[in-house]
């Protein structure tokens, strides 16, 4: 069995598990980013120098000193330069273990979750916990940019193919932002569908929108984690379109109370922090 198979087979994802009511940071499981980056040929030198996996956690709860349950929404930012990504089911199980644990304050919960995730990721992690009264002001918004989804084209292939991007960037130099809501891939372990929207901001030769849309749709039967899909899209665009500047940002729908929104860029980019219609 290969190292990759050994790591993936050890994950709780896709396996029957028991839920615990006692705080247990050992429930968190790491997936080395190196596993997928080796396949992409970017382990030694990533084509991006900025990036993070931005999680929104909708099922965060604990007990205060009086035993009264508290509920909140957490935003977690995991640096893309961390050694590991966090496996999502293990994260859910970990948060469940916090439910019946007493903490002195919201700030203590923030600190403990941030510390535990940092150790698991072997890198920088930031955690911000919001009271529901704060988060209710989050408005539903959309990515800025031009949506490429309304093209009158026939699609007959849903197997991943980077070849759609061949000769996709020719002609004039532009700076533009393109958006698609048709991104769909499948979990690497369970093959459950992952639904997302993707924003691509670039400076370079104008990218053919039909070829780009066909490429994005080809992820429809592709099995890979959210973070890995975004790094694959980024790497493929750099390989075939060769833009001077590039940011790829995806926002996925939630599963199990968690949503993952990765972005990668090769310049000092600041992605929109928004809540989309499907989130």
Curated annotation (Swiss-Prot):
Catalyzes the NADPH-dependent reduction of 7-cyano-7-deazaguanine (preQ0) to 7-aminomethyl-7-deazaguanine (preQ1). Its EC number is 1.7.1.13. Belongs to the GTP cyclohydrolase I family. QueF type 2 subfamily. The keyword Repressor does not apply. NADPH binds at residues 88-89, 255-256. It is an enzyme of class 1 (oxidoreductase). It comes from the Bacteria. It is found in: Cytoplasm. One of its GO terms (cellular component) is cytoplasm. Homodimer. InterPro entries: GTP-CH-I_C/QueF (IPR043133), NADPH_dep_7-cyano-7-deazaG_red (IPR050084), QueF (IPR029500), QueF_N (IPR029139), QueF_type2 (IPR016428). GO terms for molecular function: preQ1 synthase activity. Coiled coil: none annotated. This is NADPH-dependent 7-cyano-7-deazaguanine reductase. Keywords: Cytoplasm, NADP, Oxidoreductase, Queuosine biosynthesis.
């Amino acid at each position: 069995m290969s190292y990759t198979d050994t790591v993936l087979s050890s994950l709780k994802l896709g396996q029957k598990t028991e839920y615990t009511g006692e705080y247990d940071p050992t429930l968190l499981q790491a997936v080395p980013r190196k596993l997928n980056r080796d396949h992409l040929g970017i382990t030694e030198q990533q084509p991006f120098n900025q990036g993070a996996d931005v999680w929104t956690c909708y099922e965060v709860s604990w007990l205060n000193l009086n035993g009264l349950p508290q509920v909140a929404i957490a935003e977690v930012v995991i640096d893309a330069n961390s050694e590991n990504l966090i496996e999502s089911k293990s994260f859910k199980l970990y948060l469940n273990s916090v439910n019946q644990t007493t903490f002195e304050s919201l700030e203590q919960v923030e600190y403990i979750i941030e510390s535990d995730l940092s150790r698991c990721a072997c890198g920088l992690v930031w955690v911000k916990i919001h009271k529901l009264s704060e988060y209710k002001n989050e408005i539903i918004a959309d990515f800025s940019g031009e949506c490429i989804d309304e093209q009158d084209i026939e699609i007959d292939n849903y197997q991943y193919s980077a070849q759609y991007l061949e000769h996709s960037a020719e002609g004039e130099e532009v700076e533009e932002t393109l958006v698609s809501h048709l991104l769909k891939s499948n979990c690497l372990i369970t093959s459950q569908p992952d639904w997302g929207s993707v924003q691509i901001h670039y400076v370079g030769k104008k990218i053919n929108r039909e070829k780009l849309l066909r490429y994005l749709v080809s992820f429809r039967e592709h099995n890979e984690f959210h973070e890995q899909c975004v790094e694959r899209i980024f790497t493929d665009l750099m390989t075939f379109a060769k833009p001077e500047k590039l940011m790829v940002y995806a926002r996925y729908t939630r599963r199990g109370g968690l949503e993952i929104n990765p972005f990668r860029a090769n310049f000092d980019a600041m992605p929109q922090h928004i809540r989309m219609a499907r989130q």
